[in-house]
Amino acid sequence: MAGRNQNRTASLAGIQASGHVHTFGNCTDNDMLEEDAEVYELRSRGKEKVRRSTSRDRLDDIVILTKDIQEGDTLNAVALQYCCTVADIKRVNNLISDQDFFALRSIKIPVKRFSSLTETLHPLKGRQVLHPPPVPYFQEQDTVPANDSPSSSESAGSFLKEVDRDIEQIVKCTDTKKENLNEVVSALTAQQVRFEPDNKSVHRKDPYYGADWGMGWWTAVVIMLIVGIITPVFYLLYYEILAKVDVSHHSTVDSSHLHPGLTPPSHHREMGNAIGPTKGIPVGQQDDHRLYRQDPQARD
């Protein structure tokens, strides 16, 4: 037990020397025994290292500019003018409240190293001294365009003249004065038709659809008329003509039976060939038969 207590006291003394464990006067040996004597030193992990490195990089990227405070300047106005936050200005100038700003003659402003402000003001490399020579921002801003004022004014004047010419041409091209409403409507419709091809893409019609064999609606209508009207009409006419021919044939046959003296042209042909019209009897014998039929009483 004595050796174990000596080892624990030695380890605790080493820990106290490192500054990680604080002992209190009320602590006893029993309390120290209950607690875990093995205490390890915590090391910073990757995220904390990255945070520290990023914070250092941010501090290195910041450049401090000084500006003389003039009448009408406020803390918010300076922050808006130099694109920074009020908290950053307070932190750099050790300001507790906004009222402390009015007690200063010059103010330090944190600005990023690579920005438009650093390019225009030409600050010193790195951080400046606590009291550097003041840089008149407004005077330099006035002097920079003063060197190029003639060329800039000439270019601006020429640009404005060109704009005026373009406006005059547009006004001449678009004459809005119309005498009648019809002219207004025609002008608006012409403009609408002019702008329609730009907005709408022209879809090319495919002449072959597959199901209708590439036929249009008018060809379908013509086919329906032919099938539904013209074909039945021709059919009826054909059968009417056939019926008339049959009726005329039957009428000629009936007339030949009713009037035996009238011989049809076929009988005349048979007589010309010396053949009887009925049973192939010669003409002389036919006369004898006629005489026999005409005088039956004479024979009696």
From Swiss-Prot:
Gene3D superfamilies: LysM domain
GO terms, molecular function: peptidoglycan binding
Residue positions, PTM Phosphoserine: S55
Intervals, Extracellular compartment: 1-216
Bilayer topology annotation: Single-pass membrane protein
Database matches in Pfam families: LysM
Protein name per the record: LysM and putative peptidoglycan-binding domain-containing protein 3
Protein species of origin: Rattus norvegicus
Name of the coding gene: Lysmd3
